[in-house]
Swiss-Prot record:
The gene is GRXS10. The lineage of its organism: Eukaryota, Viridiplantae, Streptophyta, Embryophyta, Tracheophyta. May only reduce GSH-thiol disulfides, but not protein disulfides. Residues 1-101 form the Glutaredoxin domain. This is Monothiol glutaredoxin-S10. Keywords: 2Fe-2S, Cytoplasm, Iron, Iron-sulfur, Metal-binding, Nucleus, Redox-active center.
Length: 102
């Protein structure tokens, strides 16, 4: 989990993704459309991808991707992120983490 914690704390928003996952693509688009430039970790293309996926599973990510971290804290996977977006809470989290300026 150390590698996940280290990567998650490097930027205001970090998305652990797989390049072939349609839900990962949708979540990345959501953040881009909000004006956020997240760090993207494509675990299927990372040499430590299996270790990262295992660590995400231990955090409770099911499925393991997309896994979204805001301000270094695990926010959730696609369902949770979409719920936060729809109820307006995601924008608040992004502002608090310094990922949004407006």
């Amino acid at each position: 989990m150390d590698v996940v914690a280290r990567l998650a704390s490097q930027r205001a928003v970090v998305i652990f993704s797989k390049s072939t996952c349609c839900m990962s693509h949708a979540i990345k688009r959501l953040f881009y459309e909000q004006g956020v430039s997240p760090a993207i970790v494509e675990i299927d293309q990372d040499m430590y991808g299996k270790d990262i996926e295992w660590a995400l599973a231990r955090l409770g990510c099911s499925p393991t991707v997309p896994a979204v971290f805001v301000g270094g804290k695990f926010v959730g996977t696609a369902n949770t992120v979409m719920t936060l977006h729809l109820n307006g809470s995601l924008k608040i989290l992004l502002k608090e983490a310094g990922a949004l300026w407006l």
